[in-house]
């Protein structure tokens, strides 16, 4: 919505332009009228829409044509004033003033025009018979108001309609020649309907209609009013009401009716509540609400976010099989202007039979987006209507910004639930297979798969009895680590091929260059263990290297057969406890402490639960 409104009054000499302005401001007909009034600014607090309004007069005696063109260029709306008793001033509306205002402008970019018939006190009848042909000829004419500056009749209405033409314009919504909603408006209202009907049955129930009404207008509809609305739709459409609910066609018809009856502010209120601007595009303020993220912090979905996303999943899982089919996923993304997830999704998260997306994989993908690009995540939540459906100011309500990592290290504990692991190693080590194994795919299954590759894989692991999300990122040796800023992560997995004698050198070099002086926990993983281990050409063995640098001993891994998930838990645990020395992570006493901590937490929780039950 515009922040202010600039109204320009045009018309032939002596039609009463200046008198109208002075009558509005002084609330009386002026005894003496200057040839032109100074620009008037009406403050926001005295206008119905709470928007400051500037009213500009025009005088052909005082102003040149160049000055007139400048004023037209600055105006948001033009009031063409005519004398209801003078047919020549009416004729000049179409032959002179409207062509001067809009000239050769494109239909969608023309200035809105209000026709103002002044001096109605001097005429018994109405000028509308002469005006209607002009209104039919020029679609940019919003309305016509007959008034009297002398009797103060309809003066405030003139400027109200002018303001309304700017703040709630008809042109973006409705094509008066075709007598139907414009495509962009229909598209926006279809998205709004899809968001508002929350069980995906293509019908707005009474409950959903009331929630929609409350959200947009601040109060629910009375039961009789609901029935009256449906009755109007039913009488005028063949399929607007079904199973006592409003269909999409019924919803579109209602908005068309509002506009045709001059109540387009109703449709604009709906559109703006759902984030649309005057061009019917979602605003940046709606899609990208401000979120402060300190340098060492990360971003995660909180339980509000997961709860909302699970509900959205269940809405589109029509067959209730716990997984979204391609058509169900397409339905899910119907409120997006584009499909945000590509074919690599199948290699990023766990999928069900036939490539369907189960709830677990779906939540993992959202977790990945929230961690890597929170602003994109906020955008996606905005498309789904999070602020409206959750009755929140913005979708930042669904996001937790974690404590800075330096504070976690200082306090010796972290509250994070999502960790990033960089998987680093020379080409051909088996990094991609390691990522796919995290999703439960054996090497044989990977070789038979035609899924497109992904540099990420996301899954959950247990750390001390608690479920955490672990994101694996495969570092491209050709493009990554060009600078130190490429290295940060929660844990580094340095992977070498035990069957290649030159493989360990790369990992040792990366460790010394980027991680030896850092506080990032590191684990060395010897891959392809099933192919036999050879001596590494490094001077000292991988085990000796790890011992020398106080790291846990190398973990041997193979993708043959059923993947072993132990290493993934070790990586997540190292990320969750970065304050501990790396060698402590490999000791039995550490793992016992983690297990005992989880057990104690469970016992305390159960004891509190029983105490609460007794108190009830």
Swiss-Prot record:
Chain residues that bind Mg(2+) 2: 432, 474
Spans within the Mitochondrial intermembrane topological domain: 614-616
UniProt catalytic activity: GTP + H2O = GDP + phosphate + H(+); ATP + H2O = ADP + phosphate + H(+); UTP + H2O = UDP + phosphate + H(+)
Quaternary organization: Homodimer.
InterPro entries linked: EF-hand-dom_pair, EF_Hand_1_Ca_BS, EF_hand_assoc_1, EF_hand_assoc_2, EF_hand_dom, Miro, Miro-EF-hand_domain, MIRO_dom
Residues that, per the record, bind Ca(2+) 1: 199, 201, 208
Sequence positions that bind Mg(2+) 1: 18, 57
Principal localisation: mitochondrion
One GO BP: mitochondrion transport along microtubule
Matches recorded under Gene3D superfamilies: EF-hand, P-loop containing nucleotide triphosphate hydrolases
Binding site for GTP 2: 428, 430-433, 528, 530, 559
Domain spans labelled EF-hand: 184-219, 304-339
Record GO cellular component, one term: mitochondrial outer membrane
Record topological domains on the Cytoplasmic side: 1-590
Organism the protein comes from: Xenopus tropicalis (Western clawed frog)
PANTHER family the UniProt entry points to: EF-HAND CALCIUM-BINDING DOMAIN-CONTAINING PROTEIN 7
Single GO MF descriptor: GTP binding
PROSITE patterns documented for this protein: EF_HAND_1, EF_HAND_2, MIRO
Keywords on record: Calcium, GTP-binding, Hydrolase, Magnesium, Membrane, Metal-binding, Mitochondrion, Mitochondrion outer membrane, Nucleotide-binding, Repeat, Transmembrane, Transmembrane helix
Cystine pairs: none
NCBIfam families: small_GTP
SUPFAM superfamilies: EF-hand (SSF47473), P-loop containing nucleoside triphosphate hydrolases (SSF52540)
Record: residues binding Ca(2+) 2: 317, 319, 321, 328
Residues binding GTP 1: 16-19, 59, 118-119, 121, 149-150
Name the UniProt record assigns to this protein: Mitochondrial Rho GTPase 2
Function per UniProt: Atypical mitochondrial nucleoside-triphosphatase (NTPase) involved in mitochondrial trafficking. Probably involved in control of anterograde transport of mitochondria and their subcellular distribution. Can hydrolyze GTP, ATP and UTP.
């Amino acid at each position: 919505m515009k922040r202010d409104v600039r109204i320009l009054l045009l018309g032939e000499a002596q039609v009463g332009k200046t008198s109208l302005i002075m009558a509005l401001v002084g609330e009386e007909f002026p005894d003496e009228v200057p040839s032109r009034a100074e620009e008037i600014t009406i403050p926001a607090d005295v206008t119905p829409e709470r928007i400051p309004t500037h009213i500009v007069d025009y005088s052909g005696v005082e102003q040149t044509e160049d000055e007139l063109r400048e004023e037209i260029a600055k105006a948001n709306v033009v009031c063409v004033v005519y004398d209801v008793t003078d047919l020549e001033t009416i004729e000049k509306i179409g032959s002179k003033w409207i062509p001067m205002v809009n000239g050769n402008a494109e239909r969608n970019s023309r200035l809105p025009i209000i026709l103002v018939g002044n001096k109605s006190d001097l005429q018994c009848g109405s000028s509308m018979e002469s005006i209607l042909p002009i209104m039919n000829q020029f679609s940019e004419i919003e309305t016509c108001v007959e008034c009297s500056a002398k009797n103060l009749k309809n003066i405030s209405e003139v400027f109200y309609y002018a303001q309304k033409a700017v703040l709630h314009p008809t042109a973006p919504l409705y094509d008066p020649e075709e007598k139907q909603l414009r495509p962009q408006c229909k598209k926006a209202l279809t998205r709004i309907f899809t968001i508002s009907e929350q069980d995906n049955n293509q019908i707005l129930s009474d409950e959903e209609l009331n929630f929609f009404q409350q959200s947009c207008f601040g109060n629910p509809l009375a039961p009789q009013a609901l029935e009256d609305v449906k009755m109007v739709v039913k009488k005028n459409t063949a399929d607007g009401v079904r199973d006592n609910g409003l269909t999409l066609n019924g919803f579109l018809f209602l908005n068309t009716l509002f506009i045709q009856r001059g109540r387009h502010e109703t449709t604009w209120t709906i559109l703006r509540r759902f984030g649309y601007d005057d061009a019917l595009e979602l605003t940046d303020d709606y899609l990208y609400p401000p979120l402060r993220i300190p340098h060492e912090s990360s971003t995660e979905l909180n339980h509000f976010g997961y709860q909302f996303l699970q509900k959205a999943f269940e809405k589109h899982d029509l067959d209730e099989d716990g997984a979204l089919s391609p058509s169900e996923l397409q339905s899910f993304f119907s409120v997006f202007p584009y499909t945000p997830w590509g074919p690599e999704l199948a290699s990023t998260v766990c999928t069900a039979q036939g490539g369907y997306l189960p709830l677990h994989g779906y939540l993992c993908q959202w977790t990945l987006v929230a961690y890597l690009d929170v602003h994109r995540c906020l955008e996606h939540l905005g498309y789904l209507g999070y602020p409206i459906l959750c009755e929140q100011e913005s979708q930042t309500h669904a996001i937790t910004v974690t404590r800075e990592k330096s504070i976690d290290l200082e306090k010796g504990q972290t509250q994070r639930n999502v960790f990033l692991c960089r998987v680093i190693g020379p080409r051909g080590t088996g990094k991609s297979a390691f990522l796919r194994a995290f999703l439960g795919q054996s090497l044989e299954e990977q070789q038979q798969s035609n899924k497109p590759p992904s540099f990420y894989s996301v899954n959950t692991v247990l750390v001390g009895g608690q479920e955490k999300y672990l994101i694996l990122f495969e570092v491209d040796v050709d493009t990554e680590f060009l600078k130190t800023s490429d290295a940060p992560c929660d844990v580094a997995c340095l992977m070498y091929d035990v069957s290649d004698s030159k493989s360990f050198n790369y990992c040792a070099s990366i460790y010394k260059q980027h991680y030896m002086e850092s506080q990032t926990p590191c684990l060395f993983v010897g891959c392809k263990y099933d192919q036999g281990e050879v001596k590494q050409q490094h001077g000292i063995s991988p085990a000796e290297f790890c011992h020398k640098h106080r790291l846990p001993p190398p973990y041997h891994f193979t993708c043959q057969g059923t993947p072993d998930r132990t290493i993934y838990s070790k990586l997540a645990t190292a990320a969750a406890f970065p304050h501990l020395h790396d060698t402590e992570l490999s000791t039995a006493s550490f793992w016992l402490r983690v297990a005992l901590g989880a057990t104690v937490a469970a016992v305390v929780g159960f004891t509190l639960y029983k105490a609460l039950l007794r108190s009830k």
